[in-house]
Amino acid sequence: MERSPEEGAGPEPSGQSPATDSTRERDGGSGVPPAGPGAASEALAVLTSFGRRLLVLVPVYLAGAAGLSVGFVLFGLALYLGWRRVRDGKERSLRAARQLLDDEERITAETLYMSHRELPAWVSFPDVEKAEWLNKIVVQVWPFLGQYMEKLLAETVAPAVRGANPHLQTFTFTRVELGEKPVRIIGVKVHPSQRKDQILLDLNVSYVGDLQIDVEVKKYFCKAGVKGMQLHGVLRVILEPLIGDLPIVGAVSMFFIKRPTLDINWTGMTNLLDIPGLSSLSDTMIMDSIAAFLVLPNRLLVPLVPDLQDVAQLRSPLPRGIIRIHLLAARGLSSKDKYVKGLIEGKSDPYALVRVGTQTFCSRVIDEELNPHWGETYEVIVHEVPGQEIEVEVFDKDPDKDDFLGRMKLDVGKVLQAGVLDNWYPLQGGQGQVHLRLEWLSLLPDAEKLDQVLQWNRGITSRPEPPSAAILVVYLDRAQDLPLKKGNKEPNPMVQLSVQDVTQESKATYSTNCPVWEEAFRFFLQDPRSQELDVQVKDDSRALTLGALTLPLARLLTASELTLDQWFQLSSSGPNSRLYMKLVMRILYLDSSEMRLPTEPGAQDWDSESPETGSSVDAPPRPYHTTPNSHFGTENVLRIHVLEAQDLIAKDRFLGGLVKGKSDPYVKLKVAGRSLRTHVVREDLNPRWNEVFEVIVTSIPGQELDIEVFDKDLDKDDFLGRYKVGLTTVLNSGFLDEWLTLEDVPSGRLHLRLERLSPRPTAAELEEVLQVNSLIQTQKSSELAAALLSVYLERSEDLPLRKGTKPPSPYAILTVGETSHKTKTVSQTSAPIWEESASFLIRKPHAESLELQVRGEGTGTLGSISLPLSELLQEEQLCLDRWFALSGQGQVLMRVQLGILVSQHSGVEAHSHSSSSLNEEPEVLGDPTHTASPVLEVRHRLTHGDSPSEALIGPLGQVKLTVWYHSDEQKLISIIHSCRALRQNGRDLPDPYVSVLLLPDKNRGTKRKTSQKKRTLNPEFNERFEWDLPLDGTLRRKLDVSVKSNSSFMSRERELLGKVQLDLAEIDLSQGAAQWYDLIDDRDKGGS
């Protein structure tokens, strides 16, 4: 702001100011007071004043007449005084702001203790330039803008309000005046932009207006309004893109970088909003509404040319970058806690608030510490550079009100220029310093350096969230042909987008099945190779799903510039329902020359830390990896198949022992310190259990499997025999399938099959193992394990102290599913050494996780970790051996390794070696005349029959089935996997299920039915059915599979969508491959 000598000239040397002269003219011009009103006017004024004071006493009288206590009167008085205090404060602020804007030059000179003539002409502010010419234009335009606002509110807004609610049919604007005080542009700053097609402007906007807007609802005699308002903030204006045609600028974007300050002076019924409590609540709600469309990252876009390209990206552009903020520590903080009425000075319980724009993070509280160590990491999106700031505020946690300890601010532009900043920053408004490491992560449009980023992130001990490797921006545009609600009503669609446990929602679009959203959503990705984007299109009630989409983010890694811009077909929706989205992924990359992080395991200056005072021994170096003993990871899994028994002793007697009955046998197993038990088979001397148990065993010699058979009785169970099997033979041979003669009884034998499953450090065979387990799974057994997890917990460091000074007595709890292992307790130390191992059976490695809690005796949880096992599947040798950061303070050194459970007699080796030549027959181990085990058969047929046929799908769709015969159990097994491309009759999608009959019987004994799937043409069932039949009886039957749908809610009629009939004599039941079968109409005679 430059001032010329003419502008700095003082006022005319007159004893009176122009304002005084004009006042005198209004009062009569001579300084003599005007003639007073008559006696009647004076009496009326006195009566009015008396009436107002009398009116104040009316609430007091009413409270006394109603029998209310004096507390209600005092409460009302307190509310009134609070309202008056807020009201007077707003009016004073409004008057001061108006006075400042009316006489800015004089007040500025007085503040500098100079007269107008003494203010030098060379005083200027090079960053911000005055724009008085713009203010003069606004002054001239302001009355016409007021006329436009009056027409807009009266002709557009008022009718909309009256139509929205029947109670507001008498709503009107009784007064609309923008006043004489227009918006002022205090200064303009033009930023040099790195892009040639963009101009950045910052406008310092100040509005201290005397506007008055009054509304009235005549039906309820309700009046309300606004009389005066203040708004101050920095408005950024972006002119982009610059084009070669008029008007040169393609669009204008406007937004506030920070939330502006707002102060409203209410009138009428809205005076109630000035009551303390309501005042802050109403101001916050209004500011939230403004921020929802005009505060970064939201912006107002005004296109200036038609058919502008990339409007969605202009409205929500890609971030400029990501800043990874490492909040490490603070030192020299002031003490705020006092004891014994301030006589004893304590410490503080500090925590930090980190803000960048609207993104806010809160650290954990460190109790009683003036030099806290947080060691926390946050990732923030930077939308605009320059302009945004990193702000850190430190507080002392108190039960009532937290005490302020200091703050620091830093422009994000400095981080962009430096790449990495690692400094101690002084706290303003307090004492002490805060230690921050700030890293600028660039956004790369290709996946070339993704592996390098993932490898680096694995070494970062980040809390409370793991470090991100990429960012995903989803531009949700529109949808087409969504299904209608019941009664052919238009839905109110909205969209839920989820990546792992982070879910964001779009706004709802009302009464349309072709909604347009035009919204942007941003997600941080830890590993885009394994994560998915889940999209659910729902009605605004969230109860009705209109469509769904699951998109593996690995698809973007192979797309051009990591971008997909296309229509996506919705599942569980209409046949033509689709969603248009633009997905943009960017890899977060830190320059390799700066990849050095103090919080990396092993990278801290542990060796440079001096030992305790008085010690002459150097501190031992911190280990990088664990050192487990030689027995760790050598466990195997023993799978025990308890099949059947024969010729058991009859123990039941009736009529005092005169009538001999049978027995109710069950089997009890004891092995490796565990006790297992089958179910009871009622009244059978030749029972079939067909149950499977799994036990983790070691190779220690001398172990035995104790088997006992009992008859279940009401009082005491009767003994039916026992047998002991040495585990050394089974562990060496890997397989045992024998009839065991029971000992200590006259008769009886038990059929037992034992398998040793050796864990393998490769995930190549996992999918095959999971599918084989699903096929050999019995109904009476728990789900079979697919992997073995071995954990070695060595030590922990830097655990939090009790009450800030006393070390805890920590122990750890390892949990997977419902299985837990508790370590020993190490007394009074923040660096315990456990050196303990534990093993867990894993049934679904993709879905399960390892939970670790470090607890202290009497102090609760000190820290925790949740490690998804899916991360191990991506590691070489399926193993992680490093330091892991706890969610609280501290770290643990741990080795976690996974082994896939593959039977040595399952035929996997034969397939893996012969897969290169499909013509080669798999090698059969052992005696060629010996019947192959069912597991071998299953594995062999999976390798050749699992892929679906590529033939054309029939007009009624297809059903996927697996049919095979289990020779050992003498059961026919059928698995209904799924259907695809089913027929749709009418506008509503079917609710399909599958009904299975074993012809020629049509009774309930052979009928099976799957669960029902809602509103889909591609249902997934994966349900298994069994029939106890001999092989010869099975070959004389046909399997009738019908896909049906409920025709309506009130009707019991079932609509046939298609069927297929399989002659079991024409199928190779030993192969049992999963195959797709064409559905036919009931009138057709064909097969599949």
UniProtKB/Swiss-Prot annotation:
Transmembrane annotation, as ranges = 31-51, 55-75
Q: Where is this region: Disordered?
A: 1-38, 599-630, 911-930
Q: Which residues lie on this side of the membrane: Cytoplasmic?
A: 1-30, 76-1088
Query: Which SUPFAM superfamilies does the record match to this protein?
Result: C2 domain (Calcium/lipid-binding domain, CaLB)
**Phosphotyrosine modification, residue list:** 993
Q: Which residues bind Ca(2+) 1?
A: 336-337, 396, 398, 403
Q: Which InterPro entries match?
A: C2_dom, C2_domain_sf, C2C_KIAA1228, Ext_Synaptotagmin_C2A, Ext_Synaptotagmin_C2B, Extended_Synaptotagmin, SMP_LBD, Synaptotagmin_SMP
- Tell me the SMART domains matching this sequence: C2
Positions contributing to Ca(2+) 2 binding: 337, 349, 396, 398
- Gene3D superfamilies in UniProt: C2 domain
Q: In which tissues is it expressed?
A: Ubiquitously expressed with a higher expression in spleen and white adipose tissue.
Quaternary arrangement and interactors, per the entry?
A: Interacts with ESYT2 and ESYT3. Interacts with ADGRD1; inhibiting the G-protein-coupled receptor activity of ADGRD1. Interaction with ADGRD1 is abolished when cytosolic calcium increases, relieving ADGRD1 G-protein-coupled receptor activity. Interacts (phosphorylated form) with SLC2A4.
Q: What is this protein called?
A: Extended synaptotagmin-1
Query: Which organism encodes this protein?
Result: Rattus norvegicus (Rat)
